[in-house]
């Protein structure tokens, strides 16, 4: 989705400088003039005074620590055929273009190929990609606060965002991957919502600490976790592109332009039998060198696609899309007719818009809730859950291709593994600066195993097979540093539920219990916030719907 009717993807100059997202920075580069873009013409950087261009801000996750993809980059003089071939070979749906000075000058997406190339019958082998690319794409600096960048992408309704560091494009941010991560964690949080709420109450009772604080929104969620249906976010009179099996790919792309859509529903006697998307056209038509004038939809469509019903819960629809790893989901009415086609960005944008305009919820509160949502979704390290980021060894080396690989390190993260009560081993990456963060990661995997009235002691196994207590942030930091010093790449954790626990020398039982109580309380609060925001979007949609 290059644009989807949102703000045009113009370059955004860095606030306070004439800086344009480029492969290499130039001293004389300009960020461009004004214009009627809905977004200001500047890079997506934080407006906060605490911004640092040289490093990451303390306590806030930055774009650099999101799930980034390597950027496939080619010269803008490359032919469309070669560009499409490389995109198909790498199985990516976005390509960055550079000018003769190796400066970033454009972006090309699968939707551009369908609507600007195939629909207009351009000669793939003779037309340079510069003729159809979106010029001067929006970019984001690597040290931009991640929450702000993601919310800007949702508001702008575009998926792909080049990431710039020290004037060079280092990666590409695909919001769909970030949203799928959030969806997976939302799903886990929603399933554990009641257990988390009970755990919060239990910890408050045992430790005499108020975790949630004066939060009316949280109290509302405890009383009623409402999951609205897809019908609440589908606009009236939605136009759906429907085609037949015998229509040609060329004809369908022309209709995509007319409907401003990147997906066509394939129908037989008003029944859905397939779906054809712009990515299908790239991967199955152009890459196979099939003639779009004569190739029929039936030959290249995805048959019998997953679908949803108008009364399906939003969370369930997101779960289907996450499991299937696809972007478009047809929505059917009770008669089986397709009434809409949704995607993750559509759903998230609708939820955010509704949250921001709900009666009784001011913009500051709505923005705060959305920030908590993103913060919760990003609470774990980006390499968790089967990181899809490719390694350098997996890179496809193509001649004359400029390829930017992801080579980020995460100096404040470390690998951990932990066995649950069912004998299953959990492996994950986690920040090491705070014991609360580690406990949060444990709760998100083993929350059902842990009773708030019998909180375990966290221990790790050292090189002598001794179990050593982790009672504070300093303990955690020391354990990780020691593990690194002896060449270990991870720590094995244990949860000790016995009444008589070993303690570190120099730390009293009272001090340790105090530190532990604070860490467990803060961790439960973090996990509860994730459940709250996942369900909270549903509550806000419900409140808005009933206030009209």
Swiss-Prot record:
Biased segments, Polar residues type: 1-18
SMART domains named among the record's database cross-references: CBS (SM00116), PB1 (SM00666)
Phosphoserine: residues bearing it: 18
Superkingdom classification of source: Eukaryota
Keyword ATP-binding annotated: no
Localization per record: Membrane
GO cellular component: membrane; plastid
Regions crossing the membrane: 521-543
Gene3D superfamilies: CBS-domain, Phosphatidylinositol 3-kinase Catalytic Subunit, Chain A, domain 1
Membrane topology qualifier: Single-pass membrane protein
PB1 domain: residues covered: 411-498
Keywords of the record: CBS domain, Membrane, Phosphoprotein, Repeat, Transmembrane, Transmembrane helix
Ranges for region Disordered: 1-58
Domain CBS as annotated: residue spans: 63-126, 133-190, 233-293, 301-358
Listed Low complexity bias regions: 37-56
PROSITE patterns documented for this protein: CBS, PB1
Keyword Phosphoprotein found: yes
Entry-linked PANTHER family: AMP-ACTIVATED PROTEIN KINASE, GAMMA REGULATORY SUBUNIT, CBS DOMAIN-CONTAINING PROTEIN CBSCBSPB4-RELATED
Protein name: CBS domain-containing protein CBSCBSPB4
């Amino acid at each position: 989705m290059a644009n989807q009717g949102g703000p045009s993807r113009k370059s955004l100059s860095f606030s306070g400088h004439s800086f344009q997202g480029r492969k290499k920075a130039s001293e004389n580069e300009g960020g461009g003039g004004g214009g009627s873009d809905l977004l200001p013409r500047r890079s997506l950087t934080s407006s906060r005074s605490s911004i640092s261009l040289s490093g990451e801000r303390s306590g806030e996750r930055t774009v650099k620590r999101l799930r980034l993809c390597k950027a496939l980059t080619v010269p803008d003089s490359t032919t469309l055929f070669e560009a499409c071939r490389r995109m198909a070979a790498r199985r990516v749906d976005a390509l960055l273009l550079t000018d003769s000075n190796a400066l970033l000058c454009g972006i090309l997406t699968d939707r551009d190929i369908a609507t600007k190339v195939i629909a207009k019958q351009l000669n793939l082998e003779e037309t340079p990609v510069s003729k159809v690319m979106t010029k001067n794409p929006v970019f984001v600096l690597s040290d931009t606060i991640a929450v702000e960048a993601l919310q800007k992408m949702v508001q702008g309704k575009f998926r792909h965002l080049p990431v710039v560091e020290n004037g060079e494009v280092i990666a590409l941010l695909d919001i769909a991957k970030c949203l799928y991560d959030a969806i997976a964690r939302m799903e886990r949080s929603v399933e554990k919502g009641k257990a988390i709420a009970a755990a919060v109450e239990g910890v408050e009772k045992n430790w005499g600490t108020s975790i949630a604080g004066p939060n009316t929104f949280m109290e509302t969620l405890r009383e009623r976790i409402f999951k609205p249906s897809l019908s609440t976010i589908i606009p009236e009179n939605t136009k759906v592109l429907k085609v037949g099996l015998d229509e040609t790919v060329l004809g369908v792309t022309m209709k995509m332009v007319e409907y401003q859509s990147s997906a066509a529903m394939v129908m037989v006697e008003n029944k859905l039998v397939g779906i054809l998307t712009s990515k299908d056209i790239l991967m199955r038509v152009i890459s196979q060198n099939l003639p779009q004038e004569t190739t029929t939809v039936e030959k290249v469509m995805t048959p019998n696609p997953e679908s949803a019903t108008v009364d399906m819960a939003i969370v369930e629809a997101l779960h289907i899309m996450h499991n299937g790893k696809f972007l478009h989901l047809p929505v059917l009415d009770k008669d089986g007719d397709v009434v809409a086609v949704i995607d993750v960005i559509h759903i998230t944008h609708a939820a955010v818009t509704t949250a921001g305009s709900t009666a009784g919820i001011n913009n500051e509160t709505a923005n705060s809730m959305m920030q908590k949502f993103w913060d919760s979704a990003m609470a774990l390290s980006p390499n968790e859950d089967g990181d899809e980021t490719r390694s350098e060894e997996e890179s496809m080396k193509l001649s004359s291709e400029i390829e930017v690989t992801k080579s980020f390190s995460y100096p404040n993260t470390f690998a951990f593994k932990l066995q649950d009560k069912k004998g299953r081993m959990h492996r994950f990456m986690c920040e090491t600066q705070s014991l609360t963060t580690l406990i949060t990661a444990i709760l998100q995997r083993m929350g059902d195993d842990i009773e708030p009235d019998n909180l375990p002691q966290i221990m790790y196994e050292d090189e002598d097979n001794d179990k050593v207590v982790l009672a504070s942030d300093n303990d955690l930091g020391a354990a990780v540093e020691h593990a690194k010093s002896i060449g270990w790449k991870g720590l094995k954790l244990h949860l000790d539920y016995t009444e008589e626990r070993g303690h570190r020398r120099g730390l009293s039982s009272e001090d340790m219990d105090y530190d532990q109580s604070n860490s467990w309380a803060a961790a439960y609060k973090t996990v509860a916030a994730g459940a709250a925001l996942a369900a909270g979007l549903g509550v806000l949609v419900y409140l808005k719907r009933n206030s009209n």
